């Protein structure tokens, strides 16, 4: 979390590189370094953040643990044959990391990659996804409602010639239940708003009678 980590460097698609500690302007010294990931895992497509980082390659997942010293980061392969084909299929809520691989939906729990869409969900999604536009899949989490979501183009949209996503499959990681929604979008992402003060109420309306939400509700608390 104290480094900027990048991957898929021009000319070295399997390379990760990190900045100096607490200084993203430094790329030489201050514990900055790089590492070429060995094996046939493919190019780096996503890197998660936090106290523990996960580097997603197309067919491999590598865990990054900060140890300092000459080593800086300890790199451990936790998934030697499964990764994320597309980087945008990865999303996280703090240390909970979710992703879609070419054989289904998964969550990383420590050093374990656990299937969350085994059987029915994975079969449904594989049949419903318009694979000609699979690169349009976009994932995001809603931490307040404990949801991991994947926006995708379905085969049922017969008029879709541009790959616009028309469905969203949703996993509630508190209840471990799935749901499906119709939509028409190309992006989803988490966004948190600040709280409203009395001074900011004019942004909503100059007349309190025109405001639909009661002033004593959590609508105005922010963070949603």
Regions found by a protein language model. Give the residues of each.
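Carboxylate/His-rich catalytic cores and anion/metal-binding grooves
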Residues: 1-26, 30, 40
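Beta-sheet-dominated scaffold domains
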Residues: 3, 39-224
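Hydrophobic alpha-helical transmembrane segments corresponding to the first two to three helices
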Residues: 35-37
